[in-house]
A protein has these predicted regions:
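A SIS-like phosphosugar-recognition module
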Residues: 1-178
Length: 178
């Protein structure tokens, strides 16, 4: 009701129903895209970038890949990494694959940075996959992106022949901390 009282939506129930319906229609495409991206990420370290507005989604993708595929992944945001981290592409120590989460509502300056950054990555032969976040409303775009990230992490685990469910190292850490 807070969302409705603020005038952001007519009714929270309506937006949830609309989001649920749209996600149902997108399910197959999300699954397929997740599998395809997982194949591209196999053997590489994913670095996920987004605008500050979507930073929580970048972090979610990173933690899902860490936990489910049992491999490193990192994240950062436009424009912060443009001040220093971008220099690391001149001398990359590792096999990286950049994933950019891109929302149509991102600020025009962020969009410009993304375009320039993709061009620079091409000059340094760093693979990049841009994920255009789509949906009729912010909630749909949010859930679509979370869902796709989960499919990427799950399928990346399968690519590595790893069971994504156990978290043995976390359990060991917790046990030793007692």
């Amino acid at each position: 009701n807070v969302i409705a009282n603020c005038g952001l939506v007519a009714s929270p129930n309506d937006i949830v129903k609309k989001t649920s319906k749209e996600l149902g229609l997108k399910q197959k495409g999300i699954e397929t895209s997740g599998k395809e991206l997982a194949k591209k990420l196999k053997g590489k370290t994913p670095i996920i970038y987004s605008s500050q507005k979507l930073l929580c989604l970048s972090e979610k993708w990173k933690t899902d890949i860490n936990e489910n595929a049992k491999t490193h992944a990192f994240y950062n945001m436009f424009s912060e990494f443009n001040h220093n981290e971008i220099c690391s592409y001149e001398n990359p120590v590792g096999n990286f694959h950049v994933v950019i989460l891109n929302d149509a509502d991102d600020h025009i300056r962020v969009k410009k940075r993304i375009d320039i950054f993709k061009k620079l990555l091409g000059e340094y032969n760093t693979p990049v996959q841009e994920i255009a976040i789509k949906g009729d409303n912010y909630l749909t775009r949010l859930f679509t992106t979370v869902w796709m990230g989960l499919y990427v992490a799950y399928n990346l685990a399968l690519e590595y022949n790893i069971d994504p469910t156990p978290v043995k190292i976390i359990e060991s850490l917790k046990k030793d901390l007692k």
